[in-house]
Structures are given as structure tokens and as C-alpha cells.
Amino acid sequence: EEILQHLNENLGFLDGAVITGGEPTLNKDLPEFIKKLYELGLKVKLDTNGTNSEMLHELLEKHLVDFVAMDIKCCFENYDKITNSQVNIEEIKKSIDIVKKFPNYEFRITIAPGITKEDIVKIGEYLKSRQANKILAIQQFRPGKCFDKSLEKFPKTSESILEDFANLAKSYFEKVIVRKE
């Protein structure tokens, strides 16, 4: 209710809302919250890591989001190591297949410590094989407020590394975007 009140008070300055992490699809009340955003006349962008394909399917089936950005952390075989948690890769794959059917989406990968060119190749090959290769955003890692505190000691990803990864990704994706600070 606090969030909705704040948004309502600032409607003159807003045209949309971004729903982001933790992982918003883990909240069972998310569809109802989004309906309230639409009642305010706002567009909705959802940021997700793809770990709850069932909720993602419901949101897209009911046309409750205008844009989906799904993070893919790394190649599938390294997910547990890179995320420092156990991840159900089949859920990620199901989510990819759901998102690709939606007209307004992008996949994103943050070039964080431990991410390699091999990750880009494997992600690119997989998404292309699933016809889910419309847009990839290559994002700059920025230390600060990292869930994994051990990452705080690393510098932000250099622009030259971002460009190298983006150039590699262009072999697999229709469009590659580089996002820096």
C-alpha cells in the first residue's frame, strides 16, 4: 500500500513502473499488485531471473506486463558456482521458452567476475537454438550492494571488455545492447 500511495502521489511524473529484485515472481501477490499498477495507468516492466516459470507464464498469459527483462547469469553448467546457490536449470529453460513468445522482451547478462567469453558463446548458442535470440543486453558489473559480498572487491567491468563480449554476442543475437553505468 505504501508503494501504491507513493506512485499515486507522483503520477504526473511517471508513465511506468519497474518490478525488480530480489526475485519478484516469488511473491504470490504479484499479479494483484500489477493490476493495481494498471489501475493507476502505469505500464509495467518486469525484471526476473527466470526461476519461477509458473508465475512468469501467468503474468504473460494474462497480459500483466508490458516488457520482460530476464537475466541469464552464465552458461547453465556454471550456474550454481556463479550464483553461489542451487538453481533449477529446467526452470530457467522453461522461462526462456515462455519469455521468447512475448513480443517485448530482452535477455540480459551482467559481465561480472567469473563470466567468460565461453559463457556468451554457450548462452548465445542455446538461445539461438530456441529462437529466443532477439535482444541481448550486455551489462556492466558495478560493485556496491552485491548480494554476494565477495564481489565488492572487484572493479566495474571495463568498456573494452564489454565491447569484446558484445561483439562476440552479435554472432548469435539480432540485436546486442551494451549498458554501462
Regions found by a protein language model. Give the residues of each.
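Short, charge-patterned binding micro-sites
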Residues: 22
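Conserved AdoMet/S-adenosylmethionine-binding subsite of the radical SAM
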Residues: 2-16, 25-162
